Every structure is written in C-alpha cells, then in structure tokens.
Amino acid sequence: MLIKAVHYLLCFACIYVLSHAEPIISQPQSFASFKINNDTTQNEGSCVYTVTISTSCSSISATRDHISLAFGDAYGIQVYAPRLDDPWSSTFERCSADSFRVKGPCTHQICYVYLYRTGRDGWKPDTVKIFGYYSKPVTFYFRAFLPGGIWYGFNYCSSASSFSSSSSSSSSASK
C-alpha cells in the first residue's frame, strides 16, 4: 500500500514538473534588429568552418535567391558569409545538401544561426549544420520557408541580447 502511494506521488511530481518546464525554441524566429558588425578586423583568430545546408524536399525545385548566413557564440564572436548561393550552379536545389567552407574569427560553442534571403523565388531550408575547430558540431532544424528581407533563425545563447554589440565578422565563403 505504501509503495502504491509513493508511486502515485512520484507520478504526480513528474507531471507537475514537466507541465511547468520552459519550452525551447523549436521554430525559427525572425530577428529584425540583428546587425552584422564589421567594426573588428577579419584576421582576428582565423578559423575555417564547414557549413552544410540541406534544402527541404518541399522547397521549390531550385532558387536563384541570394542567401546570406551569420552564426556565432554567446561571447559576441560572429561569422558572416554575405552570399552562399551561386547563380551559375545548382546550389540549394530541392532534396539536396550543399557544403560551404566559411572563414572567420574563431568562436566558442556556436549557439545561434541566422539566414537572410533576398529574391522572388523563395526557399525552404531543412537543416543547417556547422562544424568548427573549437566547438562541437551543431545542427539547427529550420524546416520552414525563409521570409524575404529579414534575418531568420535560432538563438540558443544565454546572453541573447548582447552578442551583436561586440561581434566580429568575416566575409569569405566558398563552396
């Protein structure tokens, strides 16, 4: 009888705790105030990242839109690639994955990523995977059409409001 009471009490406690848990951001968010900061030098601890972006099978067949990428850590270090797409190749085709080498300042653990799209075609990324020398590989699950003209993505940094004020950037990306 005592064991049953303890079991019910533990079940109730688990349900109570889970019902009060804070949700994590599971959908990408727009970030209108996001700024690329070009104030610092591009040679500040140069690292190379591999960024693999998979395009959803429910995206359009191919996009000619311009796609930019920015990612970084909770300490304000930012890596920026102003244009990943290549209008002369088959970049960002439906059901495909494209990998890019992006050079930029060395970050700690990457905790945010934003994509920016300009153009009329539209595009639906599935995942963005970032591999860096000083951070564990990280995958962000977009699975949504990118709106045009606004930074759109995820920010899991603990100091979400402070990273854009002291960030550094790079502008070299190659496929």
Task: Indicate where each model-derived feature is located.
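Regulatory, non-catalytic segments
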Residues: 2-175
